[in-house]
């Protein structure tokens, strides 16, 4: 049966994606430039195993400020401060499980808050995206 495609009976999956409007409008999706690097450029020391996720507890406003700066620079997608974040990582740092769960959620919430504040000051035809960052677990 050379040249014939054998169907497995599964319907094709929709390929619609949140990035499609950006690709259609501008041909690309511009991500932020690296949250931890910019936090370090601002003088924050990220020498804990949680890296920038440590600031979720100690300096959430710094994370929100950097997200906003990336949006102002033209980013279409900002990436949450969750790269090194994990429940075991927060537990090892002295937080309770409830606190750890709340901190993980706050990584995305801070990015969403930065996006909403940015959009309040400058309505855009395309709403910037917020993405979680998942690093190597337990690195």
Regions found by a protein language model. Give the residues of each.
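Domain-level signal for soluble alpha/beta catalytic cores
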Residues: 2-139
